[in-house]
């Protein structure tokens, strides 16, 4: 069987520059999604394009530790560190979900030095929509 010769300039071998452009972003939106199992922090510009994101799982927390307030604080710090370097000074915060990491993530955002124009709770609440699942019996 003949050996396959790797082509120079193929997509897998050559990578031209960094994928993320380092634009100057003065204002952005920080989305915090806090579930009982994990906390995901996404930073976007005002048009909704994702600049940076982090979660408790990507920060190295496994299992039930992902739902802790400390994990949420670490995830928020990681997501915001990159956008502060890109020059973000002001931000709006949208918090979604009932998780333990809500307050801890907000505390980490406040401590980062970004001025918050407002904090909004965007947790979806049904107007008596679908029937909820039956109660757990343990």
From Swiss-Prot:
Residues 1-25 are annotated as: Disordered. GO terms for cellular component: chloroplast; ribonucleoprotein complex; ribosome. GO terms for biological process: translation. Its main location: plastid. Keywords: Chloroplast, Plastid, Ribonucleoprotein, Ribosomal protein, RNA-binding, rRNA-binding. PROSITE patterns: RIBOSOMAL_S11. The keyword DNA repair does not apply. The keyword Cell inner membrane does not apply. GO terms for molecular function: rRNA binding; structural constituent of ribosome. It is found in: Plastid, Chloroplast. Residues 9-25 have a biased composition (Basic residues). It comes from the Eukaryota. It holds the Pfam family Ribosomal_S11. InterPro entries: Ribosomal_uS11, Ribosomal_uS11_bac-type, Ribosomal_uS11_CS, Ribosomal_uS11_sf. HAMAP family: Ribosomal_uS11. Part of the 30S ribosomal subunit. Belongs to the universal ribosomal protein uS11 family. This is Small ribosomal subunit protein uS11c. It comes from Eucalyptus globulus subsp. globulus. The gene is rps11.
């Amino acid at each position: 069987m003949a050996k396959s010769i790797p082509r120079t300039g193929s997509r897998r071998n050559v990578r031209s520059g960094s994928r993320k452009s380092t634009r100057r972003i003065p204002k952005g939106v920080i989305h915090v999604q806090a579930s009982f199992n994990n906390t995901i922090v996404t930073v976007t510009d005002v048009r909704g394009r994702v600049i940076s994101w982090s979660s408790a799982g990507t920060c190295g927390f496994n299992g039930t530790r992902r739902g802790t307030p400390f994990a949420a604080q670490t995830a928020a710090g990681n997501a915001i560190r990159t956008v502060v370097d890109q020059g973000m000074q002001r931000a709006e915060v949208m918090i979604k979900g009932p998780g333990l990491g809500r307050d801890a993530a907000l505390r980490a955002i406040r401590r980062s030095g970004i001025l918050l124009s407002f904090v909004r709770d965007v947790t979806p609440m049904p107007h008596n929509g679908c029937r909820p699942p039956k109660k757990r019996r343990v």
